[in-house]
Amino acid sequence: MPTLKGIPVVTSGMKVERDGVRAIKDGVKHNPRAEAAPRGRKPSWLRARVPSGEGYQAVRDIVRTHRLSTVCEESHCPNIGECWNAGTATIMLMGAVCTRACRFCAVDTGNPKGRLDHDEPAHAADSVRLMGLSYVVLTSVDRDDLEDGGAGHYAACVNAIREVNPETAVEVLTPDFNGVPEHVHRVVDARPEVFAQNVETVRRLTHPVRDPRAGYEQTLEVLRLAKARRPDMLTKTSLMLGLGERDEEIRETLEDLRAVGVDIVTFGQYLQPTRNHLPVERYVSPAEFADYRRMGLEMGFLEVVAGPMVRSSYRADKVLEKNNVGLESAS
């Protein structure tokens, strides 16, 4: 089996081509657990509307025109209709093919072999201008094929957006850059308002939930490095619930995050994107999400956004308002 920096790359599954890069569709190989996974109707609180409306169409047209990838589309986000109708979008940088294959994620996996759109910073800046955004979230696939993991490209995109849209606040939701301090610092030095790196799940479930190249401690270190570099910058992370985590593990994770100075946490329900991804172990109720939010606020986080349909970028602009306090729990 081929390897990328010593780690096997998924080679089985439906092969597709994305902008000249061969990839495995949805980023996963056959999952034997899927055959035994419980099936049933989702709870009523998890039913999202079919995306439609003039705002949704306008944002979609801009994304197509400027050849942008959005995490909204690539991750099958259930909030795409609500967010795009509000004229906001999370831009996914560096293409639509990820070098990693996390068991929860529907993004295609492959080896882009160093391909990078050097016009993307200008395209992203112009798209922010066209959409009239006051707040933009930049995220990306993992790019272990690049020497700096894409840190320089992130910085270039932030700088381009700043030049064209000086009033726009920027959040970056980055890869872990393999924990290399210089790469983390390069992004932080571009001075985004918010730096985010997702821990995704509790320590015990990190593997098999995340790709072997990712790690619980590595994410904590990236968040620590970012905060230490710029103490005035907000740091943020996100957890999916419903993968088999226990309450005491959630509390332990929150304690670990506070210890490295994280300011904002989001909680959302894990939803299985295809039958080959990890099955949902349970559906967490809105009342339980409210309890987790209270737990986090009592531990000193500036804000905790928690709800079944919450994703890491959901209502991100609202969290920055009013000194990051006063946001109602999302259900």
Curated annotation (Swiss-Prot):
It catalyses: [[Fe-S] cluster scaffold protein carrying a second [4Fe-4S](2+) cluster] + N(6)-octanoyl-L-lysyl-[protein] + 2 oxidized [2Fe-2S]-[ferredoxin] + 2 S-adenosyl-L-methionine + 4 H(+) = [[Fe-S] cluster scaffold protein] + N(6)-[(R)-dihydrolipoyl]-L-lysyl-[protein] + 4 Fe(3+) + 2 hydrogen sulfide + 2 5'-deoxyadenosine + 2 L-methionine + 2 reduced [2Fe-2S]-[ferredoxin]. [4Fe-4S] cluster 2 binds at residues 98, 102, 105. The lineage of its organism: Bacteria, Pseudomonadati, Pseudomonadota, Gammaproteobacteria, Chromatiales. Its EC number is 2.8.1.8. SUPFAM superfamilies: Radical SAM enzymes (SSF102114). Its main location: cytoplasm. GO terms for molecular function: 4 iron, 4 sulfur cluster binding; lipoate synthase activity; metal ion binding. Residues 84-302 form the Radical SAM core domain. It is found in: Cytoplasm. Binds 2 [4Fe-4S] clusters per subunit. One cluster is coordinated with 3 cysteines and an exchangeable S-adenosyl-L-methionine. The keyword S-adenosyl-L-methionine applies. Its cofactor is [4Fe-4S] cluster. The gene is lipA. Keywords: 4Fe-4S, Cytoplasm, Iron, Iron-sulfur, Metal-binding, S-adenosyl-L-methionine, Transferase. GO terms for cellular component: cytoplasm. Belongs to the radical SAM superfamily. Lipoyl synthase family. HAMAP family: Lipoyl_synth (MF_00206). [4Fe-4S] cluster 1 binds at residues 72, 77, 83, 313. Pathway: Protein modification; protein lipoylation via endogenous pathway; protein N(6)-(lipoyl)lysine from octanoyl-[acyl-carrier-protein]: step 2/2. It is an enzyme of class 2 (transferase). This is Lipoyl synthase. NCBIfam families: lipA, PRK05481.1, PRK12928.1. It comes from Alkalilimnicola ehrlichii (strain ATCC BAA-1101 / DSM 17681 / MLHE-1). The keyword Membrane does not apply.
